[in-house]
Amino acid sequence: MHSSPRPPSLSHPRAGQCIFRKVAPKITHRHAESNNPYMKEAYDDAKEHSYISYLDANNLYGQAMVQPLPITNFEWSEERDVNTLIETFADNETNGCIVKCDLEYPAELHDSHNDYPLAPERKLVTQDMLSPYAANLQHQLGINKDVCEKLVPNLQDKEGYVVDIRNLKFYRDHGLIVKKVHAVITFKQSRWMKSYIDFNTEKRKQAKNDFEKDFFKLMSNSCFGKTMENLRNRVDISFVTSNRTWGKNATKNDRMIERKLASPLYDGHIIYNEDLAAIKQKKKDLLLNQPIYAGMCILDLSKLHMYRFHYDVIKKTYQDKAKLLFTDTDSLCYYY
């Protein structure tokens, strides 16, 4: 922020805090075998050539952080026409918006999008969602059957989906249907992180050892991490000792421990031994001053980069000949 030409605003609509919310790792095919001359003795020239390629997006978050990102002038918009929003903001260098909308995933896209569905969302994963294979694996490994929330790429319709307008344009152009727009936040945006990220990227190129490369990579990624920090997860930890006397005979230290344990902010404790424990308390006051709106857009732009490569490069070049085996946040593995 200090190296930016204009620091971002750290105040925005209170309700907007809740509208802002990674690419989910996913295994699509569990088994594939390549067959080509590079396999040496394993190569079978009687069979058709096939390859497995693992492709990594170098500096994925860095490329997103040099894009135009929200900076100030956050306002609720009354505009609800998605075409107008896309025409106004999707390719706008100085103005942007985030949209909360309902999306329909047409059935005719399911086969072609099954390996890398657009618009992943956080969902409560229940037992009825598991395939027979997954359910059997859960039983064999003794995995807890409690309902849990996960980031899930899926082909279902979305309700109340929050998305950057640039991603929404890509989703629409690739067949998803915007059924309804619920809310829109507009803002001024600029490439306010570009000079800092470019500096780190250039220093990383010039690095002469692994420490320097990792250091300047960390300088960029940790900056992104702070934009996504959930300040509500911060806690106070007190290390305490006790003479184990209570009531009227309690010492000042013991009464302090009693107050912490009885406090509505109490959030658990760890006992290390008979004489030492740690008491965890939630923060009494929180100052929500992290630019989470920037973090949300960085995540969306990172997804967009991966989606563009898959759908607009690999799919267009190889069509059905390229099969996506698995993905990670910044990588794709193909069999073709």
Short names for language-model regions:
Residues 1-336:
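Conserved acidic
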